[in-house]
């Protein structure tokens, strides 16, 4: 399975994601911000980092690059797309997932391990979990607080993917830290599954996100 890992100026988690995708058994390849055709890929991951230095706001400039038009085409072709941290912010900016990820309630960079509850298993990335399973992954962001004007609609549509369990470190509405589109194929999560994919890192809970992509495609 060929999985694209998108690189923007300022991305810094692309090599980590590429490494974990290889461990999961995928065939990852780097994709640059100016590529206009991704038809040869089976799925895409938009990794974390600080695309374009987070100027204007996190993800705002990356959202208008040529590669994001190609990502929209992949979505129309019903191929899975995962955005992690800055990647989640980018997906929200382009409107592929509901709501926004904005400045933390305390205006500081938040970097810590968190406990999370998996709220839906209908996405390719959470299909190997059980609903309401509690997992452990780290977060690292300054603009990760989730907000939506009509949060009841997000819950009713089963679009909440991850929710903080216990402590809500950034003030996200309802503790939400991961959402998906209505199809479940586009998933945006602020925690870093690639940083929780090997025993030496302290958790392997995140590895299921990447194995799930392969399982989804059979």
Curated annotation (Swiss-Prot):
It catalyses: N(2)-formyl-N(1)-(5-phospho-beta-D-ribosyl)glycinamide + L-glutamine + ATP + H2O = 2-formamido-N(1)-(5-O-phospho-beta-D-ribosyl)acetamidine + L-glutamate + ADP + phosphate + H(+); L-glutamine + H2O = L-glutamate + NH4(+). SMART domains: GATase_5. Keywords: ATP-binding, Cytoplasm, Glutamine amidotransferase, Hydrolase, Ligase, Nucleotide-binding, Purine biosynthesis. GO terms for cellular component: cytoplasm. GO terms for molecular function: ATP binding; glutaminase activity; phosphoribosylformylglycinamidine synthase activity. InterPro entries: Class_I_gatase-like, PRibForGlyAmidine_synth_PurQ. Its EC number is 6.3.5.3, 3.5.1.2. GO terms for biological process: 'de novo' IMP biosynthetic process. Part of the FGAM synthase complex composed of 1 PurL, 1 PurQ and 2 PurS subunits. Part of the phosphoribosylformylglycinamidine synthase complex involved in the purines biosynthetic pathway. Catalyzes the ATP-dependent conversion of formylglycinamide ribonucleotide (FGAR) and glutamine to yield formylglycinamidine ribonucleotide (FGAM) and glutamate. The FGAM synthase complex is composed of three subunits. PurQ produces an ammonia molecule by converting glutamine to glutamate. PurL transfers the ammonia molecule to FGAR to form FGAM in an ATP-dependent manner. This is Phosphoribosylformylglycinamidine synthase subunit PurQ. It comes from Methanothermobacter thermautotrophicus (strain ATCC 29096 / DSM 1053 / JCM 10044 / NBRC 100330 / Delta H). The gene is purQ.
């Amino acid at each position: 399975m060929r999985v694209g890992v998108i690189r923007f100026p300022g991305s810094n988690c692309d090599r980590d994601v590429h490494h974990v995708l290889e461990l999961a058994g995928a065939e990852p390849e780097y994709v640059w911000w100016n590529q206009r055709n991704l038809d040869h890929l089976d799925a895409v991951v938009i990794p974390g980092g600080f695309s374009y230095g987070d100027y204007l706001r996190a993800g705002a400039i990356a959202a208008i690059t040529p590669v994001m038009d190609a990502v929209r085409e992949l979505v129309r072709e019903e191929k899975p797309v995962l955005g992690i941290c800055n990647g989640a912010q980018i997906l929200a900016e382009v409107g592929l997932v509901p709501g926004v990820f904005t400045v933390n309630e305390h205006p500081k960079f938040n970097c810590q391990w968190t406990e999370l509850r998996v709220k839906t298993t209908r996405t390719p990335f959470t299909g190997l979990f059980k609903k309401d399973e509690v997992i452990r992954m780290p977060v690292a962001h300054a603009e990760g607080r989730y907000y939506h004007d009509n949060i009841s609609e997000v819950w009713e549509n089963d679009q909440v993917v991850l929710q903080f369990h216990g402590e809500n470190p950034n003030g996200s509405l309802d503790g939400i830290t991961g959402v998906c589109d209505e199809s479940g194929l586009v998933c945006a999560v602020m925690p870093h599954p690639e940083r929780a994919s090997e025993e030496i890192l302290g958790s392997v809970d995140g590895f299921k996100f990447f194995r799930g992509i392969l399982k989804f495609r059979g």
